[in-house]
Curated annotation (Swiss-Prot):
CDD domains: DEADc_DDX46, KH-I_PRP5_like, SF2_C_DEAD. ATP-dependent RNA helicase involved spliceosome assembly and in nuclear splicing. Catalyzes an ATP-dependent conformational change of U2 snRNP. Bridges U1 and U2 snRNPs and enables stable U2 snRNP association with intron RNA. It comes from Debaryomyces hansenii (strain ATCC 36239 / CBS 767 / BCRC 21394 / JCM 1990 / NBRC 0083 / IGC 2968) (Yeast). Keywords: ATP-binding, Coiled coil, Helicase, Hydrolase, mRNA processing, mRNA splicing, Nucleotide-binding, Nucleus. This is Pre-mRNA-processing ATP-dependent RNA helicase PRP5. One of its GO terms (cellular component) is nucleus. It comes from the Eukaryota. Belongs to the DEAD box helicase family. DDX46/PRP5 subfamily. The Q motif is unique to and characteristic of the DEAD box family of RNA helicases and controls ATP binding and hydrolysis. It catalyses: ATP + H2O = ADP + phosphate + H(+).
Length: 913
């Protein structure tokens, strides 16, 4: 037990000695004093330990006093030093002010750079607050921990450059460290940090100036912004406006003039399969007839006149054509055509012989069947369509209604013969038409514009015309007159040259014959009953009004119309009546008047959607619909064939005789009788002359013609001879020449507005040398938005006279999508809020290619029509209006880009155009 206790006591004492030594070691490290010698393991009493501690503390205090006395000269600042410091601070402040003054005289190019750099603030307190840029945080520190100051103000700082200053250190949030280092800071350190900040600005300024020097041209003129010229910023603003205007103009023109590109076809590089044209073998009984009997036969057939080489003789019976029994059963059984009509008797043998034909015959004479029967023989003789093949027969018409009428006639045969056909026209969904063509259509009936769309759809992969061997132009004169010649020519260039081409119409003016001969090969001309002749089955009547006042004339015409409707309604309750007017607005106004008088009726014209036009014709054609009156423009004068249509009323006289022939030709079809009544005023000398001529050509006796009409006609023709009156024949009043005249008149008006009257005669002379029309230049000129700022209050505003500047921006001619993006509520509200201007929609929207009328009726009075749709921008300052214009122009450019993108993408669906 004793040995154990002694061992424990020894270990305990050693542990205590070690602890004492450790405490002494810590004390020595803290006080940084030498350790007195103490033997290891020696035990000390409390008194000895305390005495030794006191000695160590006294030595440490003495050493601290010596250390504090050595640097005292550095901290003490004498009065002389304080004066020198004040002078130095004053000099530096003066140099800073001088530097600021120089900075204000220089370009504003560094304003953005200066805004990015945080400011350096010196407060009035003893301790400065320093704000530094992020770029100043990373500095290269020399080995001695001090940084060299850069020259700022030139040679006057040479002395300062030789001095070395403490390195500027980033402030921290360590408060203990800040408090510890406060006594070591000096005023020189503050100024040195300011020098560093100013030197940084100087370096940035020199860098910008170097960039400007690099942008100088060889002539020494700076290209960069804000160099040397005060007005250069204005020039840049003008250039930017012009650049935006050019972008807007190019995008608008590109969108307006965008064509359906059809690549030229080199027929020499395509190996076409041969095909058969001649399907007709002249019967023996026809071939044995002498020429005298053939002439007599043509005379009996309404006086058929033929012109050409080796003209085919006419037939007498359907059996002489050698048609298949299936077709014969449809003709004689279903359609109940016992014998061919005059045009059919002469035209069908000629077409089936492989000849190109120009056929002119009166309305309702069976022209459609004349080109349909040979087409069916063409298709039956050729191999079936393969995948990717286009049609074999192509029929082009000027109007949608005529295309539907022909397609309806074709359906009598195609269903029985298992022949596929497709009717393609504008105003309806193109997707369904593309789907039908993808399935394979042996016959296409359509309008030229939609046919070109289909040829260009999907980069030409929808259909092609390589297999077309039979091409028909129905109502060819109207097609050329409506400006379709470029489209028709474009289609013709894509059809094989050895095709068979057939042209039919009820009228055929001489200048149209010249155009037709360009696309025909050795044609045979067939004229039945003369050119522009009303059928003998139609009774022509004229109601002459002697009223001088327009209002009384309108009342008299409407009163006569009501009495006529009552008379024919009493005679035949199922009688269909077609009323023609000249203008779309007149059709709508007459519709309202008749509905007010409790007459059920409908109206069709070019301004209505295709679905509405189709519905109106279907209701009018139906015997159970209760609608027996249809009001129409001349759009219904072609191809409309309605059973029971016994009366045609020209409420407004036709513009020329060919149009009159087609109008009245809607009745008296297929051998049935009909009546045509024309309302005309005694002031309409030209219309009366056409009526008298038409009645004389249709063999109406002079006794049946009103003597007053003959008197007015004779007087008018005498005026034409003397030069007092002008008499235009045929379609020349509405055709391609008239479009050119409209363009020239618009340009003359613009030159007068901008003071260029002197050059008008030269300009006209040069214009006449150019081509008359183009496929996409036939439209009226599109007006580019004008962004001129006008000083003064806009006259069309009714508010107080506060807005000193305004601008009118025409948006009528922009595409619909571009208009929506420009004028939607969000876009305009942003522009108004950011610029402080007022923006208002003014004017009316006028569709493309429409002509603004000189006057319109409003509340029974003739007033000036409103201008095209535009935005009125008003502001208190010119700058506010200019800023609004810039934003609106950007919206227009954005809208044009969206419109172009949507047009290139086409409608949502499987196919694109």
């Amino acid at each position: 037990m004793n040995s154990t206790g002694s061992n424990y006591s020894l270990k305990h004492n050693n542990t205590q000695d070690n602890n004492h030594n450790s405490e002494e070691s810590v004390t020595n490290k803290t006080g940084e004093l030498d350790k007195p010698g103490v033997k290891d393991g020696q035990a000390l009493s409390k008194e000895e330990k305390l005495k030794r501690r006191q000695e160590q503390l006294a030595a440490w205090m003495q050493k601290r006093q010596q250390e504090n006395q050595e640097p005292s000269g550095k901290v003490t600042i004498s009065a002389t030093d304080e004066t020198n410091i004040d002078k130095e601070k004053l000099i530096r402040q003066q140099r800073i002010e001088e530097w600021k003054r120089k900075r204000l005289q220089k370009s504003e190019g560094l304003e953005t750079d200066r805004s990015k750099i945080k400011t350096f603030e010196v407060k009035s307190s003893n301790e400065p607050t320093i704000k530094i840029n992020a770029s100043m945080k990373k500095t290269i520190t020399p080995a001695n921990g001090r940084s060299k100051k850069r020259p700022i103000f030139g040679d006057e700082d040479e002395d300062d450059e030789k001095e070395s200053k403490p390195k500027f250190k980033k402030p921290t949030l360590d408060l203990a460290e800040i408090e510890e280092k406060k006594p070591e800071k000096s005023i020189d350190t503050e100024i040195d940090e300011l020098d560093k900040y100013l030197s940084l600005l100087e370096e940035k300024e020199q860098g910008v100036e170097n960039k400007k020097i690099e942008n100088h041209d060889d002539d020494g003129i700076a290209n960069g912004p804000g160099v040397g010229n005060v007005n250069e910023s204005d020039d840049e603003e003008i250039d930017e406006d012009q650049k935006q205007q050019d972008i807007l103009s190019s995008k608008l023109n590109r969108l307006q003039n965008k064509q359906k590109q059809l690549d030229d076809v080199d027929h020499n590089q395509i190996q076409y399969h041969p095909f058969r044209k001649d399907f007709y073998t002249e019967p023996t009984e026809i071939s044995k007839l002498p020429e005298e009997e053939v002439a007599n036969l043509r005379l009996k057939l309404d006086g058929i006149k033929v012109r050409g080489v080796n003209c085919t003789r006419p037939i007498i019976r359907w059996s002489q054509l050698g048609l298949p029994s299936t077709i014969m059963s449809i003709i004689e059984g279903r359609l109940n055509y016992s014998s061919p009509s005059s045009i059919q008797a002469q035209a069908i043998p000629a077409i089936m012989s492989g000849r190109d034909i120009i056929g002119v015959a009166k309305t309702g004479s069976g022209k459609t069947l004349s080109f349909v029967l040979p087409l069916l023989r063409h298709i039956q003789d050729q191999p079936p369509l393969k995948k990717g093949d286009g049609p074999i027969g192509l029929i082009m018409t000027p109007t949608r209604e005529l295309a539907l009428q022909i397609h309806k006639e074709l359906n009598h045969f195609t269903k029985k013969l298992n022949i596929s056909s497709c009717c393609c026209f504008g105003g309806s969904s193109i997707e369904s038409q593309i789907a039908e063509l993808k399935k394979g259509a042996q016959i296409i009936v359509g309008t030229p514009g939609r046919i070109i769309d289909l040829l260009a759809a999907n980069s030409g992969r929808v259909t092609n015309l390589q297999r077309v061997t039979y091409l028909v132009l129905d109502e060819a004169d109207r097609m050329f007159d409506m400006g379709f010649e470029p489209q028709v020519t474009k289609v013709f260039t894509r059809v094989r040259p050895d095709r068979q081409t057939v042209l039919f119409s009820a009228t055929f003016p001489r200048k149209m014959e010249l155009l037709a001969k360009k696309i025909l090969d050795n044609p045979m001309e067939i004229v039945v009953g003369g050119i522009s002749v009303v059928a003998s089955e139609i009774t022509q009547k004229v109601e002459l009004f002697e009223n001088e006042d327009d209002k009384s004339l309108e009342e008299a015409k409407f009163s006569k119309l009501l009495s006529t409707l009552n008379d024919y309604g009493d005679k035949d309750a199922e009688c269909k009546i077609l009323i023609f007017v000249e203008k779309q607005i007149a059709a709508d106004e007459l519709l309202v008047k008749l509905l007010t008088e409790k007459y059920p009726c409908l109206a069709i014209h070019g301004g209505k959607d295709q679905i509405d036009r189709k519905h109106a014709i279907r209701e009018f054609s139906s015997s159970n619909s209760g609608v027996n009156i249809l009001i129409a423009t001349s759009i219904a004068a072609r191809g409309l064939d309605v059973k029971g249509l016994n009366l045609v009323i020209n409420y407004e006289a036709a513009s020329h005789m060919e149009d009159y022939v087609h109008r009245v030709g809607r009745t008296g079809r297929a051998g049935r009788k009909g009546t045509a009544i024309t309302f005309v005023s005694s002031k309409q000398g030209r219309a009366i002359t056409d009526l008298v001529k038409a009645m004389r050509l249709s063999k109406v006796s002079e006794d049946e013609i009103n003597p007053r009409l003959i008197e007015i006609s004779t007087k008018f023709l005498e005026g034409v001879k003397s030069g007092k009156e002008k008499y235009n024949f045929g379609f020349s009043g509405k055709g391609l020449d008239n479009l050119q005249e409209i363009r020239e008149s618009n340009r003359d008006l613009e030159r007068k507005v901008y003071g260029e009257e002197n050059d008008s005669s030269t300009f006209k002379a040069n214009e006449k040398k150019q081509n008359k029309t183009d496929i996409h230049q036939s439209d009226l000129d599109v007006k580019l938005p004008d962004f001129h700022i006008i000083e003064g209050r806009a006259p069309e505003t009714a508010g107080p006279d506060k807005c000193k500047f305004h601008s009118r921006i025409t948006i009528n001619d922009l595409p619909q999508k571009a208009r929506w993006i420009t004028v939607n509520r969000d876009s305009l509200s942003k522009v108004i809020e950011s610029t402080g201007t007022s923006i208002t929609n003014k004017g009316n929207y006028y569709p493309p290619n429409s002509k603004i009328p000189k006057t319109i009726k409003q509340n029974g009075k003739e007033v000036t029509p409103p201008p095209k749709l535009y935005l009125l921008v008003e502001g208190l300052t010119e700058k506010a209006v200019h800023d609004a214009i810039i934003l609106l122009r950007e919206k227009m450019i954005e809208g044009l880009e969206v419109a172009a993108k949507e047009e290139s993408m086409g409608p949502t669906g499987k196919y694109t155009v």
